[in-house]
Amino acid sequence: MTRAIVARAPTRLDLAGGWTDVPPYPEREGGAVCAVAITRYATAAAALDDRMARAVGVSVGSQDELTAAALRRARIPGSVASVVSDYPASAGLGGSSACGVALAGALAMLRGEALSQGELAALSRATEVEELRVPGGYQDHYAAAYGGGPIARNRFRYGGEPAPASLRA
C-alpha cells in the first residue's frame, strides 16, 4: 500500500430543531437547527493498493455499505478505505454522517483535492441519500464537517451554513 490518508469527523448533539432539516419540511416551512459537535469521532483511512489497481474500490471494516458507496462515488482505481468510530451505533449522534464526512475527506485528499467544509457535507449527504437511499436531513453532515457549534441553518434546500464565528465554541 502507498499513500495512506486519515481523516476524522465529530458526531453532534441536537439541541433544538431536530427533524426540521429533513425534506420535505424545510422546503415548505424552512428549517432551523441548533446542533453542537462533540468529542466522539469517526476516523476514516483511505489508500491506494497497487495489488488492487483494477478494482474501483474495496471496503474494509465497519460501516461497509457506506464505505463502499463512498468508494463508488470517488471512482479512484485501486483505492481501499475503512472507517471506525468511538461511539455506539444508533446512538442518535449523527454517527453515519460523521463516518460519511470522514470518508469524503480522506478520499478527496487521496485524489489530491481540497474540498471546503460545505462541499464535504454536501458530498457526504449525497452519498447517503442518493447511493444508499437513506432519507435524511442536513444537520448531521454539516455538524460533522464544520465541527464546533452551534450549527444553525434555515432553508436547507440551499445547503447549510454554520453560525457566525462569535457563536461558535
At which residue positions do the language-model features occur?
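ATP-dependent small-molecule kinase catalytic core of the GHMP/sugar-kinase superfamily
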Residues: 2-6, 10, 16, 21-31, ...
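Anion-binding (especially nucleotide phosphate/pyrophosphate-binding) glycine-rich loop
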Residues: 3-6, 38-127
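Low-complexity, intrinsically disordered regions enriched in charged/polar residues
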Residues: 16, 32, 60-64
